[in-house]
A protein has these predicted regions:
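A structural signal for alpha-helical segments
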Residues: 16, 23, 43-53, 81, ...
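Well-ordered alpha-helical scaffold segments within catalytic/enzyme domains
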Residues: 26-45, 92-102, 147-160
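Alpha-helical scaffold segments in carbohydrate-active enzymes
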Residues: 27, 34-41, 50-68, 164, ...
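Active-site-proximal structural scaffolding
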Residues: 21, 31, 51, 55, ...
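Extended glycan-interaction surfaces of carbohydrate-active proteins
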Residues: 1-20, 57-141, 173-197
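Peripheral, non-catalytic segments that deliver or gate enzyme domains
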Residues: 21, 134-158, 166
Length: 197
């Protein structure tokens, strides 16, 4: 369900739930890797190995189930059918960086390009019939998702590109203040005009 991820009205969840997407599993993989590193630091080699193995297994599972021909999918849990969506949420596995196979990284990069506007990443591709400029997860730019996407791109060595997008985002903040989210086309602030992440 969209409430699990916080993207409650995303078009990825437009069908009746439950849905499975790779975003939350990607975050869980990162957490497992951190637990592995922490266990190693504490001298708990077996626990470290266990968490690393769990991370690797989950990564392989999401690649096998939630990606088709390298393309991230929103999959209906009961039927296994993919839901058509132009949501940025399917790009969030980019946080896994180099853990992703080349084909998957390239497919996510293609989707990111379609979500990119002058100011950053729209949460729904602007050419989508379901795009809403002030529609929460159906169009606006959000600071947290921008940071997550840019962090993944940075890990992939896209440093100049990340700096450019960050500069544009900062320019939007300078122009519009720091609201909860921004109109992805105009850069104007939406909703709470003094939001702090």
């Amino acid at each position: 369900h969209g409430n699990d991820s916080g993207w409650d009205n995303s078009t990825a969840f437009i069908e009746e739930p439950p849905m499975a997407l790779p975003d939350l599993s990607a975050f869980l993989i990162l957490q497992m890797e951190e637990l592995s590193a922490l266990a190693e630091e504490l001298g708990k080699a077996e626990e470290s190995k266990l968490w690393k193995e769990r991370a690797d297994i989950l990564c392989q599972k999401i690649l096998n189930i939630l990606f088709r021909d390298g393309e991230p999918q929103a999959v209906h849990t009961f039927t296994g059918e993919a839901v058509e969506t132009k949501s940025l949420i399917l790009c969030l596995p980019i946080v896994l960086g180099k853990r992703l196979p080349d084909e998957v990284r390239e497919k996510i990069m293609q989707r990111l390009r379609l979500c990119q506007t002058e100011w950053g990443y729209a949460t729904e591709q602007p050419d989508s019939q379901l795009y809403i400029s002030d529609g929460y997860w159906r169009g606006p730019i959000w600071a947290p998702t921008t940071m997550m996407v840019l962090d993944g791109l940075w890990q992939l060595g896209e440093h100049e590109f990340v700096r450019e997008v960050a500069k544009r985002f900062a320019g939007m903040v300078q122009k519009s203040g720091f609201p909860e989210n921004f109109d992805s086309v105009t850069g104007a602030g939406n909703r709470d005009r003094a939001f702090s992440w």
